[in-house]
Amino acid sequence: MKHKPIFLLAVIVLLSACGQSYEEKVRLSRAERARLAQEEAAALKVAVLPTLDCMPVYLAKQKHWYDSTQVDLRLKVRNAQIDCDTALKGKSVEVAVTDLKRVEHMTKHGVGLLTLGTTDAYWQLIANRTARVKTAAQLGDKMVAMTRYSATDYLTDKALDGVKTSAPVFRVQINDVLIRLDMLKNNEMDAMWLTEPQATTARMFKHTVIEDSRKMKEHLGVVVAGAHLMKDKKRVKQLTAFVEGYNRACDSLNHYGVKHYADLVKAVCHTDDKTIDRLPKYSYPHIALPKQR
């Protein structure tokens, strides 16, 4: 019995220590979250897709081909262009690889954007081989996967301009580029617009190319940033460092070819060796910041 008070005291001290430890952990956890949030806000965030036009961004990040003292570069990977643009519009990213028609749509709705340059992105309208469609005129009563207010929506208009179909063409909004390709593989869609490397995979499975944006003389790929960034000297330094890294990646991709970076392409585009072996030549033009007054 003599030892009971001592035992109780030890328990109280232990519980107090545990309580202090828990409170300390909560405090540190809050401080850590605040620090991480601050770093995230200060970083230059770039929205990218699992497509070849985004390869300079992926490669620059992987190789650290930018001045890390000037920019903390963070990639925000999305499978749908509309998600990248929503992030850009909401300012949760500063830069995005997108298309000219999406830029026009966002600008029309009051989003200030700065075009850094173009990409070599192209889109092919590919029909499911089971649909027996060889031309745009045969798309009557067929479903075409695309994204509203985008390059694919615009290209659908152009492909059908002056074309007489036997019935209306049904445009189905499938924004996720990977799901879009899967729907073609699973015979769930009659036709769709695809860019690389998804277009190569579709051709590999003997699906039919009926239109090509290059033959239509349409060059719609762009890299854009929020226009408000140019008012912030720190952001301008970040963009300058990003542009330098991006252009260095372009030079390497143009020199060695995209197949040289097969492992990276497989990882970021969720594709395979067979597709990469069949990829056509792809060019990567430089981007630049506008001259400041």
Predicted features, each with a name:
Residues 1-7:
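Bacterial N-terminal signal peptides that target proteins for export
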Residues 16-17:
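C-terminal motif of bacterial Sec signal peptides marking the signal peptidase cleavage site
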Residues 180-183, 202:
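Loop-centered beta-sheet repeat module
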Residues 21-172, 183, 190-196, 210-213, ...:
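Short, glycine-/small- and polar/acidic-enriched structural segments
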